[in-house]
Amino acid sequence: MRQKRKGDLSPAELMMLTIGDVIKQLVEAHEQGKDVDLNKMKTKTAAKYGLASQPRLVDIIAAVPPHYRKILIPKLKAKPVRTASGIAVVAVMCKPHRCPHISFTGNICIYCPGGPDSDFEYSTQSYTGYEPTSMRAIRARYDPFLQTRHRIEQLKQLGHSVDKVEFIVMGGTFMALPEEYRDYFIRSLHDALSGHTSNNIHEAIKYSERSFTKCVGITIETRPDYCMKRHLSDMLTYGCTRLEIGVQSVYEDVARDTNRGHTVKAACESFHLAKDSGFKVVTHMMPDLPNVGLERDIEQFIEFFENPAFRPDGLKLYPTLVIRGTGLYELWKSGRYRSYSPSDLIELVARILALVPPWTRVYRVQRDIPMPLVSSGVEHGNLRELAFARMKDLGIQCRDVRTREVGIQEIHHRVRPYQVELVRRDYVANGGWETFLSYEDPDQDILIGLLRLRKCSEETFRFELGGGVSIVRELHVYGSVVPVSSRDPTKFQHQGFGMLLMEEAERIAREEHGSGKMAVISGVGTRNYYRKIGYRLQGPYMVKMLK
């Protein structure tokens, strides 16, 4: 049979040849120890076969032969930063609902877009519906099961490991929704991982524990006034391990003028209660709010990181954006509000990042809202990178957890740790003694793993934590995702750092805190790890009596 010439081939056949050629070049480059620019390779190869468009990354990944997958998939992985911290994050959105404080303040926060009464009516509160997570949620009609399944499949196609998943529940104040809906939503997340259809939360969690894809944590976005004792107890039942609390400003006058509907004092109380329950606390903060100014903005972040009433474990920094349909938009239109200039904003963010202590992680530096929807505010999509460049000019450093993570360092700087040692930092926060233990390479300032230990204060309301108990609020070894039951000598997960951190934490709890019991707030999927080292389940915590 006569072989077809290139001119006789269909576009689909030419695309198959292009993909095969790209894979062949990648294999050759690997065997010769060369680094390649995948985008240039795809463009050049597509042109060679007369194609106007490049082959899609998912198609190249799908076509990699089985015996080359282990070698090539890490090189092909789209946005490797997504799983560089060792966990695949799956963001899901609850259904659109009104903000809870409308009933007593009469309106939403002045800068808040989205929600059922906004110009973006099919979006959730504080989102426009055009963010990537919002669009995925709308396509799934806000069904939590479908959102999870679709996102996990998408991450797999892009070459990411999804053996360990952390959920982020977004879309306004989740804890203000009816209990029946909340139970259904969380149950669906666990069922999407296990494949089992559960009748209640406890059944869903039981099956999720044994799932191949482990739920290592759930993060819930909330407000300080929906972070009280009953809310915290419900969230513990769900398997939640981290809270994202919207604070926005440490100034009471700013909270009042922006119609937040809660006080800063309430935020401090919620931090105390949350940490005494074992939660990791991440806060949302907004520089450039009305009636603040550059000087007050810098002062509030000094207060935020130095005052023991705040001192969060993580930060999402969201510079104020002016978006159509908000109260702030009307102030801006009438000339009563002006955003910082781009250079002032970069300078401010650089100064804020320099203040961040080494035990705090900066998760984000700007919102995901598409620029065409922004009337005034951030003008650059790469604000973090511009702030880092400014810091370099000023001779100052950002030493937050994310910047120093081993996985991030390897991706951005091709740097691996050489001399690893245990580092201990103690500080007081929210009425308790905190110890931040980490394995680091001090010379290169690279972080391999961390543990957050807290001596619970006497005000803790959970009976499991009363009477002299220390609690591990976080244990995390960084580096690319490695399945829970396997080892990879080139990765840092599952090499024993977690066990060493736990041993040191138990020693501190026993000898320095004088605690008779150690508790761990553990993701549902990691409970078996703690069972192997002598812990048992008590309520939502894994606990162990200390000799």
UniProtKB/Swiss-Prot annotation:
Tyrosine-phosphorylated. Also serine/threonine-phosphorylated. Disruption phenotype: Embryonic lethality by 12.5 dpc caused by severe growth retardation. Conditional deletion in adults is also lethal. Residues 82-372 form the Radical SAM core domain. Its EC number is 2.3.1.311. PROSITE patterns: GNAT, RADICAL_SAM. SUPFAM superfamilies: Acyl-CoA N-acyltransferases (Nat), Radical SAM enzymes. Residues 396-547 form the N-acetyltransferase domain. CDD domains: Radical_SAM. [4Fe-4S] cluster binds at C99, C109, C112. This is Elongator complex protein 3. It comes from Mus musculus (Mouse). The gene is Elp3.
